A protein has these predicted regions:
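Short intrinsically disordered terminal tails
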Residues: 1-3, 62-69
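General structural signal for alpha-helix termini and helix-helix connectors
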Residues: 19-26, 41, 45, 63
Length: 69
């Protein structure tokens, strides 16, 4: 996959989260923070380890950048 697909997936997640809340879509730091908080709530409710998910996501991100840190 390429960056465009990753970015579109993230934008779609932000738009859907805003829609569920009855808000206009936003693509700024506040919107990203809200979505991350929503994901923390989901992890807590379903007994998933958010910190582990975040670490794995960071590894995936580095791999997708070609291992550049």
């Amino acid at each position: 996959m390429n960056d465009r697909i990753y970015i579109e997936a993230a934008r779609a997640a932000l738009a859907r989260a805003a829609w569920v809340r009855g808000e206009a879509p936003a693509y700024n730091e506040d919107a990203i923070s809200d979505l991350l908080a929503d994901l923390r709530h989901l992890c807590a409710a379903t007994d998933l380890d958010f910190s582990r998910c975040d670490r794995v996501a960071a590894m995936h991100f580095q791999d997708e950048l070609g291992g550049v840190s």
